[in-house]
Amino acid sequence: MMYHIPGVLSPQDVARFREQLEQAEWVDGRVTTGAQGAQVKNNQQVDTRSTLYAALQNEVLNAVNQHALFFAAALPRTLSTPLFNRYQNNETYGFHVDGAVRSHPQSGWMRTDLSATLFLSDPQSYDGGELVVNDTFGQHRVKLPAGDLVLYPSSSLHCVTPVTRGVRVASFMWIQSMIRDDKKRAMLFELDKNIQSLKSRYGENEEILSLLNLYHNLLREWSEI
């Protein structure tokens, strides 16, 4: 399943990020991809050795960790270190699949269950640059407001179309979920959303408590910690 997570960064945060990224050191984006991806990748990424990068990636991690909808949809166990990319002058990233595992500074290795793109450019400021994701439900084309995030299964083939005008800047990362199976994770998310909706409409009652008990028992049954 694909999820739109709005408002991960405020407009003020986005403006500050963009101002700082104007001063960043950018390198060839192929430095962080495997052999297959390198053949179809043509973009730039912030140099991960820079002091600015260390500060910005920490801010992204803090923002997603504090976002309730992101947590409910992803049920994250491990987040990769966020990266930042830039597309301009017809740069693109052809169809590819993300690696199944990635190195992680704390855990050593992590499984990539979900991929996330946090948009940092106003969609009206550039042409092209759509994230195109192919999954079992068809093809999805994504171009979100700055500060919003899209979450999708890392098993999906995806690409970024050429940016023919302006500049597309984003942060991206991978998530190992507590729930490995996409279908089970989607069911838990739907159950959680409906519990929250019922609570806001009717307040606490025995039926809602019973549903909440069901949610946590399923999470206990399916989670890998």
From Swiss-Prot:
Q: What is its EC number?
A: 1.14.11.-
**Keywords assigned by UniProt?**
Dioxygenase, Iron, Metal-binding, Oxidoreductase, Vitamin C
Concerning InterPro entries, the annotation shows: Oxoglu/Fe-dep_dioxygenase_dom (IPR005123), PKHD_C (IPR041097), PKHD_hydroxylase (IPR023550), Pro_4_hyd_alph (IPR006620), Pro_4_hyd_alph_FE2OG_OXY (IPR044862)
So which residues are the signal peptide here? none
> What Gene Ontology molecular function terms does this protein carry?
2-oxoglutarate-dependent dioxygenase activity; iron ion binding; L-ascorbic acid binding
Which coenzymes or cofactors are required? Answer: Fe(2+); L-ascorbate
Q: Which residues form the Fe2OG dioxygenase domain?
A: 78-177
Q: What class of enzyme is it?
A: oxidoreductase
Work out whether the entry's keyword set contains Ribonucleoprotein: no
Could you say which residues bind 2-oxoglutarate here?
168
Instruction: Work out whether the entry's keyword set contains Iron.
Output: yes
Gene Ontology biological process terms in this record: DNA damage response; intracellular iron ion homeostasis
The positions annotated for binding Fe cation are: 96, 98, 158
Cofactor: bound how, per the entry note? Binds 1 Fe(2+) ion per subunit.
Protein name per its UniProtKB record = PKHD-type hydroxylase YbiX
What species is given as this protein's source? Answer: Shigella boydii serotype 18 (strain CDC 3083-94 / BS512)
